[in-house]
């Protein structure tokens, strides 16, 4: 059961402090189309958690209404090993876009799970295509993650800090939506992948931007 965000806000107003960061699937796909114009197919990488299943359902609904010409392949951690995933990405051409959501794999030892950020970096360095993501976790780090459409880490930190300060000051809880969301791109990866900076939207937040870039 998916409870609407506004219903939660109304029911728990003043009792909880929540920092809410939406996932911008529609805007992410539009950005991918803009930066990789030949894209006719999408590989959406996710795992078996409930939130991943919800993202796949949202993706199916959005592509049906807004991107009906786009063929979507759902690459799910339960259906293949990480090596199989990397091998699959090697066989896709430039017409295939790659969007990463999550790839949690259960460890062979106990019930622990391997952090998906490691897989994200491995995938970004192995894939022939630029790797787009849905949050600012691995952009501007030692990876080949290109970026995506979401709030920056600085924006998230700002809202979390405000929520903590209000709580420590004894103020009633509040619900905050992290803003603004915008295209976020690693300039070095952009150049390595052969994508023209001229294709970037005017409101793009650019990591590693050269001093002479306008």
Segments from the language model and where they lie:
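Short hydrophobic alpha-helices and adjacent helix-cap/hinge residues
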Residues: 1-214
């Amino acid at each position: 059961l998916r409870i609407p965000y506004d219903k939660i806000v109304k029911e728990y107003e003043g009792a909880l402090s929540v920092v809410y960061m939406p996932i911008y699937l529609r805007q992410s796909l539009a950005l991918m189309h803009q930066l990789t114009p030949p894209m006719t197919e999408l590989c959406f990488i996710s795992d078996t958690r409930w939130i991943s299943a919800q993202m796949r359902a949202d993706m199916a609904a959005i592509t049906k209404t807004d991107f009906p010409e786009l063929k979507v392949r759902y690459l799910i951690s339960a259906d293949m090993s990480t090596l199989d995933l990397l091998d699959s990405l090697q066989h896709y051409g430039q017409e295939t876009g790659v969007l990463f959501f999550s790839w949690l794999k259960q460890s062979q030892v106990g019930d622990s799970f391997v952090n998906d950020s490691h897989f994200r970096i491995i995938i970004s360095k192995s894939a022939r295509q630029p790797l787009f993501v849905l949050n600012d976790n691995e952009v501007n780090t030692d990876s080949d993650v290109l970026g995506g459409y979401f709030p920056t880490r600085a924006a998230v930190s700002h809202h979390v800090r405000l929520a903590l300060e209000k709580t420590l000051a004894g103020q009633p809880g509040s619900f905050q939506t992290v803003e603004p969301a915008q295209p976020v791109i690693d300039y070095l990866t952009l150049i390595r992948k052969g994508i023209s900076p001229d294709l970037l939207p005017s409101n793009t937040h650019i990591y590693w931007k050269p001093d002479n870039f306008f």
